[in-house]
Amino acid sequence: MRMKRFLTIVQILLVVIIIIFGYKIVQTYIEDKQERANYEKLQQKFQMLMSKHQEHVRPQFESLEKINKDIVGWIKLSGTSLNYPVLQGKTNHDYLNLDFEREHRRKGSIFMDFRNELKNLNHNTILYGHHVGDNTMFDVLEDYLKQSFYEKHKIIEFDNKYGKYQLQVFSAYKTTTKDNYIRTDFENDQDYQQFLDETKRKSVINSDVNVTVKDRIMTLSTCEDAYSETTKRIVVVAKIIKVS
């Protein structure tokens, strides 16, 4: 009798667990679907603005700033899902779990380090984004660890209110948060050169992009593991070339 009661309780608990787990899966699916729809609308809006103002970047971002004043840029990699606004908060925690409409989302936003200057670029501009495992946000950074992918995607597009840029990728590697790869400025040219040399040395891809202390670079950073918290990181670094 006791065993029968025990088994009944276990069955009830299992049903409850399945219901809760199923609810969370459905909830996540609905939220992700809504988030994709929101980004698609913004992508279409940005594309329309770009076609109208190809020579002048400022008007596009005036429109985006009306949506959220923290939208400071746009990053795109043709042929992939990387096509997002770049946010910048007062800290590096502001947009970890907020989208461009400041709604709480598990994927957060692509965001720029709060220390970076927008008009007068630092030596190293840093962008962060989640690795979420569904080919969105900064998932594409993992692909850069393969030479074959790099060969087909050497240039990333970046826009901000002050100009249009090409990001010429020259390094991709795995590291941890103990590695101080997120320095934004350097004491002198020698210090910066050492950083550039180390960035090239760590790379798992071969690149012929020439980078000197006169250049500015952009570092894209994401977690190595898409499904659990980790101190491991995937890093892609590019030389910044102003186009207009």
Curated annotation (Swiss-Prot):
Entry's Gene Ontology cellular component terms:
plasma membrane
Q: Cite a single GO MF annotation.
A: hydrolase activity
Q: What does this protein do?
A: Transpeptidase that anchors surface proteins to the cell wall. Recognizes and modifies its substrate by proteolytic cleavage of a C-terminal sorting signal. Following cleavage, a covalent intermediate is formed via a thioester bond between the sortase and its substrate, which is then transferred and covalently attached to the cell wall. This sortase recognizes an Asn-Pro-Gln-Thr-Asn (NPQTN) motif in IsdC, which is cleaved by the sortase between the threonine and aspargine residues; may only have 1 substrate in this bacterium.
Which residues make up the annotated site Transition state stabilizer?
R233
- Pfam families, alphabetically? Sortase
UniProt keyword annotation of Lipid metabolism present: no
Q: Which stretches face the Cytoplasmic side?
A: 1-6
Q: Which UniProt keywords apply?
A: Cell membrane, Hydrolase, Membrane, Transmembrane, Transmembrane helix
What is the protein's given name? Sortase B
Q: What happens when the gene is disrupted?
A: Loss of cell wall anchoring of IsdC. No effect on establishment of mouse infections, however reduced bacterial persistence after 9 days infection in mice (using strain Newman, which is more pathogenic than RN4220).
Query: Which family would the database say this protein is a member of?
Result: Belongs to the bacterial sortase family. Class B subfamily.
> What's its catalytic activity?
The enzyme catalyzes a cell wall sorting reaction in which a surface protein with a sorting signal containing a NPXTN motif is cleaved between the Thr and Asn residue. The resulting threonine carboxyl end of the protein is covalently attached to a pentaglycine cross-bridge of peptidoglycan
Ranges in the topological domain labelled Extracellular: 25-244
What activates or inhibits this protein?
A: Inhibited by MTSET (2-(Trimethylammonium)-ethyl-methanethiosulfonate) and E64 ([n- (l-3-trans-carboxyoxirane-2-carbonyl)-l-leucyl]-amido(4-guanido)butane). Inhibited by coptisine.
Which Enzyme Commission numbers does its entry carry? 3.4.22.71
List where in the cell it is found.
Cell membrane
Membrane topology for this entry? Answer: Single-pass type II membrane protein
TM ranges? 7-24
The family database entries (InterPro entries) matched by this protein are listed as: Sortase (IPR005754), Sortase_dom-sf (IPR023365), SrtB (IPR009835), SrtB_Firmicute (IPR015986)
